[in-house]
Amino acid sequence: MTIDSHQHFWRYDAARDGWITDSMSMLKRDFLPKDLEGECNANGIDATIAVQADQSEAETLFLLELAEGSKRIAGVVGWVDLRSPRVEERLQFFSQRERLRGFRHIAQAEPDERHLVSRDFRRGIARLREFGFTYDILIYPRQLAAAIELVTQFPEQRFVVDHMAKPEIKAGSREPWATGMRTIAQNSNVYCKLSGLVTEANWNHWKPEDMIPYLDVVLEAFGPKRLMFGSDWPVCLLAAGYGHVKQLVESYVEVNAAEHKHDIFGGNAKRFYGVKADIHGLAA
């Protein structure tokens, strides 16, 4: 089963989706499962993980509604207020929804670089494992220190770093990002998504060679059993089509980890998110 571990859906709302700036005007429209279907068919994608783009429970319910009407969406990474004193009650509520596999907070936007290890946030993280939920870490390199501290404090909790922690590819900078990624990868409960690369590069003039030093770092650090392909569709469209994004990662894997291609393009995501092929009518 080939899985895209990271894509988004939304019904565009200018007031809500303020992160979509004028420089991203092509994203100022609806992106729904019917819009992704052709891309999945053309690129051999059996299943996807739909990830939240808005920080509200309404977003989580919206994605679950889409997933429950689709065999293609194998899982949802939603949002819940992990800082709320009612977090256990909300996790209990969401645990009844089979397609919900985990949660994410847009930590990259938090002004406090240590938000991930704040007392209230850690209290919420501490409840996830009880319900079998994963956690997606969305950060910039400057927040890696806090992320390392977080994952070390919760060694039994499954974490995945989204978009390789957004290295500064356009600037050609690798440190201190590389050191941070090697450090966080020492925790066996942490995975990493090979996603979001093209939008960290020069949108109009990137080339595959720009990405290789960064891919080399995470392959060496995490190993092929803790990496997973993600398209970051439709955000990737700012810099590349779906097929180009998949080909970028596929070409790298075929040269550097060919025997683990099945893992990186499905097996690892299936294991991490607990995707059950028989439930979704998908081939294993």
Predicted regions and their residues:
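Active-site gating/metal-coordination segments in enzymes
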Residues: S56-R142, E149-V151, K193-L197, N204-H205
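Catalytic metal-binding/acid-base residues of hydrolase active sites
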Residues: H8, D54, A165, L197-V198, ...
